[in-house]
Amino acid sequence: MNIHEYQGKDILRKFGVAVPKGIVAHSPEEAKQAAEQLFEEQSSPVVVVKAQIHAGGRGKAGGVKLAKSPEEAYEIASQMIGTTLVTHQTGPEGKEVRRLLVEEGMNIDREFYVGITLDRATSQNVLMISTEGGMEIEKVAEETPDRLLKIQVDPLFGLQGFQAREAAFFLGLEGEQFRSAVSFIMSLYKAYTSIDAALAEINPLVVTKEGRVLALDAKINFDSNALYRHKDFLELRDITEEDPFEVEASKSNLNYVRLDGNVGCMVNGAGLAMGTMDIIQLAGGKPANFLDVGGGASPQTVEEGFKIILSDKNVKAILVNIFGGIVRCDRVAGGIIEAAKKIGLNLPVIVRLEGTNADIAQKMLDESGLNLIAADGLKDAAQKVTEALSA
């Protein structure tokens, strides 16, 4: 689960992570009041008005602006709130700006990157440090790997002081800035583990000309599987920032991710779903979604899956790929037929069913009289997807 920057900073502040003072605003009037308060409390000649959306690249897209007065903050907020911000992470449709973070200005001297996430290859947390702050860490890792330090952290022992000192030394910090950075990194790791985060990313971490070490931006992603331990964090979820199809799918416990292709796919099992998407691509189509209906696919989940797939107007054909292990293929076939009649499917649906009672399922599909095309194996399914798209 993702949250906004201002929410992430509020959480980090409770763990002693240094962040600039900021006030969230939902209107130009609130932005002006926030700026007035910050100008009274700080010596900086500017405040920063930042659009709050679940996407990076806001600065380049015009979502981060400086204001030298409360009146200017009001004008900036008037232009931002209600507009659609398009960044390299939002896609061409962009995201609507509904709230802003008005924050004290910083006299920045240097910018760095600090991030913590899970390294699945080693089953350990990894602390990532880079001297290239403000840049995408993937780009840094690819183009200038010598400027990125990765420190594996044993979850049994946690982040050790010598590891935090190694990170601060890598950044070239000295004296009080060195000690502040060590304290910052230790506090960030404590926050990361305490809240069961999947990612804690500070980009950039800044050192001001006055010597302060702060998180200028903060991205916190929660491990959704651990949210039952942090029910108060559920209140931080902003559904308006999420894909409406994915929100609807989650209500039916379906794992759905919308893509930009033309072939909808419904599969049971994440691995099979990934393979099915590859098959669609090789067949000349483009997957319109990732949809895993789970190991216990029922007529109800199949029906909901079809509804969600059909709500995407770019879909020209649907491939259903089910391996019947726990779930019986004839039960899934019955769900497909029932859903097709109920919804009124008018797109070609290619169905590949293998496993328990697959022969019975095949017969049910053949005798249904519906536009359901049975496929015998993955290769045949791929060929029939190609034929359906070219028809």
From Swiss-Prot:
PANTHER family: SUCCINATE--COA LIGASE [GDP-FORMING] SUBUNIT BETA, MITOCHONDRIAL (PTHR11815:SF10), SUCCINYL-COA SYNTHETASE BETA CHAIN (PTHR11815). GO terms for cellular component: cytosol; succinate-CoA ligase complex. ATP binds at K50, G57, R58, G59, E103, M106, E111. Heterotetramer of two alpha and two beta subunits. Mg(2+) binds at N203, D217. Substrate binds at N268, G325, I326, V327. Its cofactor is Mg(2+). GO terms for biological process: succinyl-CoA metabolic process; tricarboxylic acid cycle. Pfam families: ATP-grasp_2, Ligase_CoA. Its EC number is 6.2.1.5. Keywords: ATP-binding, Ligase, Magnesium, Metal-binding, Nucleotide-binding, Tricarboxylic acid cycle. GO terms for molecular function: ATP binding; magnesium ion binding; succinate-CoA ligase (ADP-forming) activity; succinate-CoA ligase (GDP-forming) activity. SUPFAM superfamilies: Glutathione synthetase ATP-binding domain-like, Succinyl-CoA synthetase domains. Belongs to the succinate/malate CoA ligase beta subunit family. The gene is sucC. Succinyl-CoA synthetase functions in the citric acid cycle (TCA), coupling the hydrolysis of succinyl-CoA to the synthesis of either ATP or GTP and thus represents the only step of substrate-level phosphorylation in the TCA. The beta subunit provides nucleotide specificity of the enzyme and binds the substrate succinate, while the binding sites for coenzyme A and phosphate are found in the alpha subunit. Residues 9-248 form the ATP-grasp domain. It comes from Chlorobium phaeovibrioides (strain DSM 265 / 1930). It comes from the Bacteria. This is Succinate--CoA ligase [ADP-forming] subunit beta. Pathway: Carbohydrate metabolism; tricarboxylic acid cycle; succinate from succinyl-CoA (ligase route): step 1/1.
